[in-house]
Amino acid sequence: MRLHLTFNHSTPATGRKNTKHTLFFGSMLACIISIISLVVPAYGANVSDEKKAKPFTHDNVIDLAMQLAQKPFKEARKAPKELIDLDYATYGKINYQENAAIWGGTPTKFSVQLFAPGFLYKNLVDIDVVENSRAFPIELTESSFSVPNDTIEKLLTQVGQYAGVRLHYPINDDEVKDEFIMFQGASYFRALSKGQTYGLSNRGLAIDVAQPKGEEYPLFKRFWIERPSKYQTAIVVHALLDSQSVTGAYRFGIYPGAPTRVDVDVTLFPRRDIAHVGLAPLTSMFLYGGLDTPDKPDYRPAVHNSEGLQIDRGNGERLWRPLNNPNKLQISAFGDEDIKGFGLIQRHRNFDYYQDLGANYQQRPSAWIEPLNDWGKGQLILLEIPSNAETNDNIVAYWEPQGGLKQAEPYRYSYRITASNDSPSFTNKARVIRSSKGQKQAKGKELLIDYSNIKPQDIEKITIDASISKGKILSSRIVAHPEINGARIFITFEPESTNVAELRIQLRKDEKPVAATWLYRWNSDDWP
């Protein structure tokens, strides 16, 4: 839409300024400018002209996903080989021009920057901005990126598409728009709260994880980003997901802050029956810490993006499972119905626990998943994959619905992701803050667990309910731990004629749980 405005304004013949008329004209002009700002896009650089704009609502994404599911899967367009062959260092020199940021020079608190294709990011994606219920494609031009050489600039311009998107907002400083969420690679995305640095990742969907035929990685192939008004502190991103087995329409309501929250609504259209599908998947890294000690000398006491899995079961029970870096692939399943929440948690928030000046693991976010509609029966799956490097993601957690997904039936799921420092449901409650191997025993193995937020006067009233699936609990005791305003328990156990045993420990007071039930899988390969 183009608006042509003509004003015929003349000064009175007397030469005196007509103040009343001028004030009226100024007010009228201000109103017209305000109206223009509502109907004319203020997107910034690299957005196509209005002739390419199309009406848009989330229903359009659902319709696209439904239509796509009725057609055979078609691989996404790939970046040219020259870009894919770039090494990490060269790709890292390709940066989106800050002065090209979408909405960067407008009153909107948010701005949008984009990722170039290349290196690991082979798939090309389309990105639109939505203003006044119309979608405008963002076009890649020679001014979109700063690049290390002319060859790369030419290749990017010829490609004309991007590999992902990141959003900026004054989350830490009112005067600085920091990156706080990114979508890049397959269906991966990561979010930050105030004061955090990137760690674990979220994914749109997981299919056939750890199955013999190999995992399938769905792709967000197109994004639509709604422009907020200058007063809004939230933003909406829509995404179209596609893979060999399923299509999906996603809506992300994103609320940056302390903590950042992402409300996800997804409608899935399976192309085939899918037995093993993962909802709200989380991917993280655990190298060592707590019960798991390093294989070789390291000045850092712990190295991980997440240290534990927390589950709030449908029956009200809370579970805490310390993570492990096993010698062999380890898969755990926690059956449930109407699960209340789950997450991978980074609980320790002090530098001394990690001693890493570069990685700052104490600033890595936790991710808490809270279903907002009925997820029914299923199981929470935890994968722990052997790893010898902190650059490898080796922890995966997701909800697997019972019965999987059936072909041609639509499925709708809603959930909330909170990028908190801890799980929201554990605020001001007794919680496990340390799990460790104890001293060497003449008989059995000693386990030590520290709990915070337990009053000294309650210690004598607490009982320890400890069990092992194969073996015996030899002893258990609890003592006050004034350094953490909590308690420390010691458990001695003896596995019998087995390589694997499940430990379960619960503190109770007046027959009621004091804290989350502590779970752990003892393995003779990891703890001889």
Curated annotation (Swiss-Prot):
Gene Ontology cellular component terms for the protein in this record: outer membrane-bounded periplasmic space
UniProtKB keywords: Periplasm, Signal
Pfam families cross-referenced by the UniProt entry: MdoG (PF04349)
Signal sequence range: 1-44
Major localisation: periplasm
Family matches, as InterPro entries: Gal_mutarotase_sf_dom (IPR011013), GH-type_carb-bd (IPR014718), Glucan_biosyn_MdoG/MdoD (IPR014438), Glucan_biosyn_MdoG_C (IPR007444), Ig-like_fold (IPR013783), Ig_E-set (IPR014756), MdoG_OpgG (IPR023704)
GO molecular function: carbohydrate binding; catalytic activity
Gene Ontology biological process terms, A to Z: beta-glucan biosynthetic process
Cell compartments where the protein resides: Periplasm
Pathway noted in the entry: Glycan metabolism; osmoregulated periplasmic glucan (OPG) biosynthesis
HAMAP family: MdoG_OpgG (MF_01069)
Annotated family: Belongs to the OpgD/OpgG family.
PANTHER family the record matches: GLUCANS BIOSYNTHESIS PROTEIN, GLUCANS BIOSYNTHESIS PROTEIN G
Record-given protein name: Glucans biosynthesis protein G 2
